Amino acid sequence: MAESLPVSSCRLLIIEDEYVIAETLAEALREAGANIVGVIRWLDEATRFASNHAGEFNCAVVDINLHGALSYPLIDMLSSQGVHVVLLTGFGVEALEAAYRELPRCEKPFNQDRLIGMLCSKFGA
């Protein structure tokens, strides 16, 4: 088990359409001390969850492309709720819409330690 990192205040929603990536990420983040509130693979399901559970999570790792649907409206919703968003994407920064280029992101294939480091910078002691 990985050493506990200062992400214990992170109540995290993972929104990723690739099952293996989502589950691997969830396990690594749990080991780092994050509280995973959900792992969701579909944009419409994630949008409903965000609407119905606002305030129950404070961070989301969001894949930009979920089964061919771009997640920008969901990212806007999460941001308006005060949720810290980290993008997980196979796109380079130049492929992102301009409004989203400054958000923290990990490009696929991603490095788990880098992603955990991003969360630590948001929720660290």
Give the ranges of each region predicted by the language model.
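Acidic, metal-coordinating helix/loop segments flanking the phosphotransfer/catalytic sites
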Residues: V39-C59
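CheY-like receiver
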Residues: F49-N52, M77, M118
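Conserved acidic carboxylate
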Residues: E16
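Alpha4 helix (beta4-alpha4-beta5 surface) of REC/receiver domains from two-component response regulators
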Residues: Y72-P73, S80-Q81, F91-K108, D113, ...
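Two-component/phosphorelay signaling modules centered on CheY-like receiver
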Residues: Y19-G38
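Conserved phosphotransfer microenvironments
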Residues: V61-S79
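Non-catalytic signal-transmission and effector/linker regions of two-component phosphorelay proteins
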Residues: M1-L13, F110-A125
